Amino acid sequence: MKNTKYCREDGYSGEMRKMDDKKLKVCLVGLSGGHLTHLYMLKPFWKNKERFWVTFDKEDARSLLQGEKLYPLYFPSNRSIKALIINTWRALKILPKEKPDLIISTGAAGAVSFFWLGKLFGAKTIYIEVFDRIDAPTIAGKLCYPVTDRFIVEWDEMKEVYPKSINLGSIF
């Protein structure tokens, strides 16, 4: 398992630096726990941008994102048609109101509605497949892949799973 690090010392990748050149409104979608931690580690990119977060209304998320604009996802969301419908409805209310230029997600089910609807509203999308997936796709990754502008993986083996992906190495 080869994990090549392509990120620069300042935490920016070349792809994200290109997007940094203009003032962006960013939507960060990730479930609480590891997905949210993964997104938070991109702080060098999002810290000076107008942004809002979409995650579970749980203690770890509230603590980490204290002072941030936060929209709650319906919980539990994995493999639940009910949750997909509720979170799609929430995305339909949030996206036209916030009008993000860019949606970034580290996955899980909550990302699906925001990516598909985000594209309809003109947002660019970046999906980061989670670090612990080395050679097999996640369900959310498979569902978001067709509408993702930049699909980022953290292992060379994942390039076989997602041929159009970019391996930027570990975010950790």
Ranges and model annotations:
Residues K2-Y6, G11-F56, L65:
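N-terminal subdomain of nucleotide-sugar transferases
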Residues G30, N48-N87, E157, L168-I171:
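Conserved nucleotide-sugar phosphate-binding/catalytic loop shared by glycosyltransferases and other
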Residues S32, G107, E154-D156:
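Helix N-cap/beta->alpha junction signal
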Residues L102-F121:
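An aromatic- and histidine-rich active-site surface loop
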Residues A123-F172:
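Active-site-proximal region of nucleotide-activated glycan assembly enzymes
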